Amino acid sequence: MGQEEELLRIAKKLEKMVARKKTEGALDLLKKLGSWQMSIQLLQTTRIGVAVNGVRKHCSNKEVVALAKVLIRNWKQLLDSPATPKGEKGEERVKAKKKEKGLDCSDWKPETSLSPPRKKRVEEPKDRRDSVDSKSSATSSPKRPSMERSNSSKSKAETPRTPSSPSSPTFAPSVCLLAPCYLTGDSVRDKCVEMLSAALKADDDYKDYGVNCDKMASEIEDHIYQELKSTDMKYRNRVRSRISNLKDPRNPGLRRNVLSGAISAGLIAKMTAEEMASDELRELRNAMTQEAIREHQMAKTGGTTTDLFQCSKCKKKNCTYNQVQTRSADEPMTTFVLCNECGNRWKFC
């Protein structure tokens, strides 16, 4: 077995150790690597440096980590040596071909400030690139100022892409159609005003009231913002609830009351979901509340103990029941049952 095949075998073993998080036997393999005469071509073809560096990062054995650092340091010195090995000449030939095609190595250098994670991922290939870059800098030093200027211009061009505040897909910045007098200077707030105005215009009847919907939406948004003092998630949820209720086709009375002035902008900005609900929904909620109160506040001691009913949860028959007239006199009585074992309640007529 040649040295290259043996290095590939050791590299696979080390990678498996790192993947399984079991580095027993890594010390013997590293000692074996330290006794060999290494070349740049072997480092490049076998990528043994990547495997050793992975052991160095994930192993908890101090002796293994120390030996891995020594090997990596020695191989770095080999890469940085003034003599030009065969592997480096091969890279120079590839570099020359790229230049003939109009490609520049500076276009893909990962050593700018825009890509720091790539430096941490793999150290051995980084060192190989460093040696190639040092070689190219010695032969083409007059081009360095222009390369630095291009890198600085790239970094300047990238800085405006960083968002100043978190944004949700609902309020993503887009072209705003509001009049300049209603713009706030904040893209999130402007988008909210635009969406509130669209909710007020959900039906064509807004024309009958002769109301400026953009102005009214701006006033509603301003009241919300003045109360919450930020455009965080609480602010956005407040705006969403106004929009959904104003656009609800089953609750047109709310939007008409806002358009007519019966509900002011300051009031709609603070109303709860229950207050904005339609009369039909309020009655349904009240009925459900009264039913729940009647079920859960029924006195336990006033019932009759029986074994005629079986609980659906605990499957036992230790129950107490009450019969109450919840509807008209000619309707059958409602039986409320309470399980004395698990507390489960149910009813039937």
Curated annotation (Swiss-Prot):
Which parts of the chain span the membrane according to its record? none
Provide the residue positions that the database annotates as binding Zn(2+).
C311, C314, C339, C342
User: Compositional bias (Basic and acidic residues) spans?
Assistant: 101-110, 121-133
A single GO cellular-component term on record: nucleus
Identify the Gene3D superfamilies for this entry: 2.20.25.10, Conserved domain common to transcription factors TFIIS, elongin A, CRSP70 (1.20.930.10), Transcription elongation factor S-II, central domain (1.10.472.30)
Q: What is the similarity comment for this entry?
A: Belongs to the TFS-II family.
**Statement: the UniProt record of this protein carries the keyword tRNA processing:** no
Main location per the UniProt record: nucleus
Q: Which GO terms describe its biological process?
A: regulation of transcription by RNA polymerase II; transcription elongation by RNA polymerase II
Q: Give positions of region: Disordered.
A: 80-170
Gene Ontology molecular functions: DNA binding; zinc ion binding
Q: Which UniProt keywords apply?
A: DNA-binding, Metal-binding, Nucleus, Phosphoprotein, Transcription, Transcription regulation, Zinc, Zinc-finger
| Phosphoserine: residues bearing it | S115, S141
Name of the molecule in the record:
Transcription elongation factor A protein 3
Which parts of the sequence belong to the TFIIS N-terminal domain? 5-82
Q: Where is the TFIIS central domain?
A: 188-304
Q: Where in the cell is it found?
A: Nucleus
